[in-house]
UniProtKB/Swiss-Prot annotation:
SS bond list: none
Pfam families: Ribosomal_L33 (PF00471)
Protein species of origin: Cyanidium caldarium (Red alga)
GO annotation, cellular component aspect: chloroplast; ribonucleoprotein complex; ribosome
The protein's name in its UniProt record: Large ribosomal subunit protein bL33c
GO terms for biological process, alphabetical: translation
Gene giving rise to this polypeptide: rpl33
HAMAP family in the record: Ribosomal_bL33 (MF_00294)
InterPro entries per the UniProt record, alphabetical: Ribosomal_bL33, Ribosomal_bL33_CS, Ribosomal_bL33_sf, Ribosomal_zn-bd
GO molecular function: structural constituent of ribosome
């Protein structure tokens, strides 16, 4: 029997510096897709990931 899989959901992470950074390498907004466990992380996630548009590691926040 399969147990409930509702605890793990797919989320999108978006770079917060891409909107305000004027000196970017190229135009666009970096987005990553990942999975989070809703029971362990009930609040919105923030991860430091590489942004190819800013050409550096920036904070990526969870979007709806």
């Amino acid at each position: 029997m399969v147990k409930h899989k509702a605890a793990r959901i797919c989320i999108n992470l978006e770079c917060i510096d891409c909107k305000s950074n004027l000196h970017k390498r190229s135009n666009g907004i970096s987005r990553y897709t990942t999975i989070k466990n809703r029971k362990n992380n009930p609040s919105r996630m923030e991860l430091k990931k590489f942004c190819p548009y800013c050409n550096m590691r920036t904070i990526h926040k969870e979007i709806k």
